[in-house]
Amino acid sequence: MKKVAIVSCYFKKNYGSLLQAYATQKILDKLNIENETINIDENIDFKKGKKKFYKSQILNFPFIKSKIGMIKLKLDRKVNKKLNKNLEIREKKFEEFRNKFRLTKPFTTYEEIAQQCEKYSDVLVGSDQLWLPVNVVSDYYTLNWVPNKVSYATSFGISSIPKKYYDKYRKFLSRIDFISVREKNACELVTDISGKDAELVCDPTLLLNKKEWLEIQEEKPIVKG
């Protein structure tokens, strides 16, 4: 049987994204399904797509407002040396945790990934908030560039989709062979936009038991205090 390729947010330095990406890979391991996660650390197409979206939001006040916390944190890090040091320690630990992933070689374009698809039986996207408008515009988590595709517990991250993005959402949702999501509202969004049904499933982090999570838990806190 061919491998399954996983498309996840394994590179984000936050607990939710990394743990969900890890759990998705671990669950496939438990099912004896050979798998690996697509490496887009150096992907030009992905970066261009995100830049394009952010440029389009320059005059969108609600969007700018939602990023104020991120901007404030960057400024705080410049003036608060202790905060910056603690965050650097945390980020280093995130990088170390990434070593638990089986990553492919880095792919610089979507075309490069598509050319490798014959190696995989399916490409699985999930979970996390991968179907936010910014990600749909960047066209990576849509899986538009591969033939055999499924989603597991993927989230839209928002309760409604702006009408101007409906065509983009309809295009990629209608081409996914099997769709599962982690929120009831997301099931409704899939049906409303594409006319397709979506299965409601639990987040992959809930599929691992306590013992399995304790196996990767640090004995001591990363940062004191």
Regions found by a protein language model. Name each.
Residues 103-120, 129, 153-155, 159-225:
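A nucleotide-sugar donor-handling region in carbohydrate enzymes
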Residues 1-2, 223:
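Glycine-rich phosphate/diphosphate-binding loops that line cofactor/substrate pockets in enzymes
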Residues 4-15, 19-171:
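Aromatic- and Gly/Pro-rich donor/ligand-binding loops
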